[in-house]
């Protein structure tokens, strides 16, 4: 009976698992994105690791410039914020096969990055969100951040499809 309960619980979590690499994006269809030329940063939920925060800001600045937006210290046409979250997913199949007394549960860290653009009235104009498994090798973090940020900005309303 316990096995059946664990199996059902596994299906529940599997069915709700996000697809890494997929981008979910929304935008205000009434907004004139071609008229937006400048942006300023506002606070979101910064990355826990300060180096990652700096990399995310740089990657978003690069991609924003790629869609024709110029960063201003204050007073931009819009504000941009980013939000991050990291969760550790436990590999339940591997967990059942291992010696539970001497080994830690196998996990994979799943990072989530959300970029939100708002107008002067704080109305959301565009948002994009993606998830990506994070390599435990911190040296690979800059490339992962850049790849995910590029992926997010492919959904920006004025960006021509490639």
Q: Positions of the model-derived regions?
A:
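C-terminal/domain-edge helix-coil "capping" segments
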Residues: 17-32, 108, 121-162
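Second-shell loop/turn segments in exported
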Residues: 42-52, 68-69, 134-139
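Surface-exposed short loop/turn segments
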Residues: 18, 67, 76-131, 135, ...
